Amino acid sequence: MPQLNPNPWLFIMLMSWLTFSLIIQPKLLPFTPINPPSNKTPTTTKTSPWTWPWT
């Protein structure tokens, strides 16, 4: 059972972290969101009470 052998764990975790931080992260950071947030004022709608026909 190779998962019980803890010898390569540190190396695998370090290589995973380096791969993410040096290769994947710079490729993901330049993307801009499709719908950027805008400064909209919240609109309040007037609610009317429900009519209860059985009272």
From Swiss-Prot:
<dbReference type="InterPro" id="IPR050635">
    <property type="entry name" value="ATPase_protein_8"/>
</dbReference>
<keyword id="KW-0813">Transport</keyword>
<comment type="similarity">
    <text>Belongs to the ATPase protein 8 family.</text>
</comment>
<keyword id="KW-1133">Transmembrane helix</keyword>
<keyword id="KW-0406">Ion transport</keyword>
<dbReference type="GO" id="GO:0015986">
    <property type="term" value="P:proton motive force-driven ATP synthesis"/>
</dbReference>
<comment type="subunit">
    <text>F-type ATPases have 2 components, CF(1) - the catalytic core - and CF(0) - the membrane proton channel.</text>
</comment>
<keyword id="KW-0066">ATP synthesis</keyword>
<dbReference type="Pfam" id="PF00895">
    <property type="entry name" value="ATP-synt_8"/>
</dbReference>
<keyword id="KW-0496">Mitochondrion</keyword>
<feature type="region of interest" description="Disordered">
    <location>
        <begin position="35"/>
        <end position="55"/>
    </location>
</feature>
<comment type="function">
    <text>Mitochondrial membrane ATP synthase (F(1)F(0) ATP synthase or Complex V) produces ATP from ADP in the presence of a proton gradient across the membrane which is generated by electron transport complexes of the respiratory chain. F-type ATPases consist of two structural domains, F(1) - containing the extramembraneous catalytic core and F(0) - containing the membrane proton channel, linked together by a central stalk and a peripheral stalk. During catalysis, ATP synthesis in the catalytic domain of F(1) is coupled via a rotary mechanism of the central stalk subunits to proton translocation.</text>
</comment>
<keyword id="KW-0472">Membrane</keyword>
<dbReference type="GO" id="GO:0045259">
    <property type="term" value="C:proton-transporting ATP synthase complex"/>
</dbReference>
<dbReference type="GO" id="GO:0031966">
    <property type="term" value="C:mitochondrial membrane"/>
</dbReference>
<feature type="compositionally biased region" description="Low complexity">
    <location>
        <begin position="37"/>
        <end position="55"/>
    </location>
</feature>
<keyword id="KW-0138">CF(0)</keyword>
<feature type="transmembrane region" description="Helical">
    <location>
        <begin position="7"/>
        <end position="24"/>
    </location>
</feature>
<protein>
    <recommendedName>
        <fullName>ATP synthase protein 8</fullName>
    </recommendedName>
</protein>
<dbReference type="GO" id="GO:0015078">
    <property type="term" value="F:proton transmembrane transporter activity"/>
</dbReference>
<keyword id="KW-0812">Transmembrane</keyword>
<dbReference type="InterPro" id="IPR001421">
    <property type="entry name" value="ATP8_metazoa"/>
</dbReference>
<keyword id="KW-0375">Hydrogen ion transport</keyword>
